[in-house]
Amino acid sequence: MEKDQVVILEKRGVILVSGEDSRDFLQNIITNDINKVSNKNSVFSALLTPQGKYLNEFFIIQNVKGYLLDCSENSTGELIKDLSKYKLRSKVEIEDFSSEFVIGVINNSKFKELQEELKSNENTITYRDTPIFLDPRNRKLGARIISNLEKLYLTIKKLSLKIIDNKEYYSLAPVSYTHLTLPTTGIV
């Protein structure tokens, strides 16, 4: 992917976890440290069964309302169901925001340019009220933008980016990154 290109990822889901207990709630059930998540840092994490078996993986981004979880569209419903199992008496709301948010990916070089412009060296920056974060798994996978569609298009226009096809984006990824989500069926 070239510096001035962006791809809008299809088949991604966005879940909002909010409420006064949201930080403690997530800290107790995910594989990463929720205390690392701030408006300047985002993480990649997973949800496991109590026996340690894989259930789901997602990015966690801090939002004004709580935490956004960027996950596979196919697993959004299942992830909400799994998170809800652990809710118990926690003061937490778990909502599917997939219809309100989209995920875009920009080149790592463009992200570095924005970091310099905003005088930041963090892995998550806010550009015009839109969070943009460097993929914590591998910087070569670019930086993700999570926004509503209208705001994403305004950001794309302001940054003079050209939208490329999903297929072109995945064809540019190294073979080991073409299937980033683990299978959700057939796991014993």
Which role fits each region the language model picked out?
Residues 1-180:
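Basic, glycine/lysine-rich polyanion-binding surfaces/domains
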Residues 179-188:
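Single conserved hydrophobic/aromatic residue that forms the stacking wall/gate
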